[in-house]
Amino acid sequence: MRHCGDCTLCCKLLPVHDGVLINGKRMQGNLDKAAGERCRYQRHTGCKVYNTALMPTCCKMWNCRWLGNDDTGDLSRPDRSHYVIDIMPDYVTVVDNTTGNQQKVEVVQIWIDPKYPDAHRDPALRRWLERKGRMALVRFNSSDAIHLMPPSVASDGQWHELDGKSEGREHSLTEIVDALST
């Protein structure tokens, strides 16, 4: 079993919104921080509130993919690779424009340390994504991201980094609803 050691990268990169919704209004929890901000409970030796009543629920539920050690043997510890992998229960459908074949692909979030903006190009990470057949939403902060598509998903068998910005026309509401309902 792997251990965090002095790695606290998840405490820096992940957003933590520990407040609760009451009558549609967000009430402040004991911690509310944006992605990329250091947690106020973080110390050089780790988390000051780890396994205490003050530990935010989302931190208790966080499951570092590297710690899992089941399928990440060739990945470096997050503070050395400069990213954390967040397994999302989300999928996208990729359609081959030539054949019309559809493929349902799992998506993971990869939170990148802003000091290392090319960390998502780590060969070990790309091998892991390719082996698992997963796409990645590479998050640089709460609002900036790209999609990383491995060759096993792309119709041309190449890696693709997609910024999500469309240079073409905008889609109508009807087109969006039709696309979502298929």
Residues of each region from the PLM?
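Short loop/turn segments that flank or connect secondary-structure elements
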Residues: 1-182
